[in-house]
């Protein structure tokens, strides 16, 4: 339920995916607006592409970017979620946040 102050906020809906949406949303969160983001889940690049193929899941990379852009979590945690492994192992190129979101999809089944 909205309180009186929240009723005065303009409602902004952002449709998209990719880096552009996360930058736009990061900027919008500093304004008194009610933000809704509709993010595509069809990306197939790097970590997301590997995880989609391996686990047959929606693309989580753009969702991860939007979550960190809109969140109020501390910078060290944001850096950890956005961190990409640079190794010669199978983790190479994976973002920690993508692995976490994929695990949540696997745990919840949705």
Regions found by a protein language model. Name each.
Residues 1-7:
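Short, Lys/Arg-enriched N-terminal segments with co-localized hydrophobic residues
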Residues 7-55, 105:
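N-terminal phosphate-binding or glycine-rich loops at protein starts, especially the Walker A/P-loop
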Residues 39-109:
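Glycine-rich nucleotide/cofactor/substrate-binding loop typically near the N-terminus or early
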